Design a protein with these regions (language model features):
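Structured interaction patches on ligand/partner-binding surfaces of diverse proteins
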Residues: 2-23
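Membrane-lipid interaction segments
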Residues: 38-39, 43-146
Length: 146
């Protein structure tokens, strides 16, 4: 959204006058980012692997799985957007994915069902593009953005 502007009086004509502007995201902007993050995580949950590619969550087993795992989202992280230089960033936020997978013991062949939530953290960067659209890069909070 746009504001009506603020009048700044300078004491010297045609000279740069330093001002400090603190941008804040609109609720609409935060909602768009939240929807995009949720969509990204939903796409992660469709991958039937223990460590979904490019995703902030995964599950490790030392035994064998008997069928591809099934992921779902138990709790989406709540997005908080803050200014970051000329762009924006997503403050680290916690979420929970849910995994359901059968695991066969290499020791005795027994099978147990893993049906549990997996906690994870996301963060990210948001870049405003020249055409007015945004580019959102979601990362895992523990690993950093790079």
């Amino acid at each position: 959204s746009r504001s009506d502007g603020v009048l700044v009086l300078a004491d010297a004509p045609l000279r740069n006058t330093p001002i400090d502007i603190q941008a804040e995201p609109t609720p609409e902007f935060v909602n768009v980012v939240q929807e995009e993050v949720n969509g990204f995580l939903d796409a992660c949950a469709t991958q039937q692997v223990l460590q979904p590619t490019g995703c902030p969550f995964g599950f490790f087993v030392t035994n064998r799985i008997v069928a591809p795992p099934e992921w779902s989202m138990a709790e989406y992280p709540v997005v908080n957007v803050v200014p970051h230089g000329a762009d924006w960033r997503i403050v680290p936020a916690d979420g929970r994915a849910h995994i359901n997978v059968g695991v066969r013991s290499l020791f005795d062949g027994s099978v147990r069902n893993v049906d549990e939530d997996v906690e994870f953290t996301i963060d990210g960067t948001i870049t405003l593009l020249g055409d007015g659209t945004i580019s959102i890069r979601v990362g895992g909070g523990e690993q950093g953005l790079d």
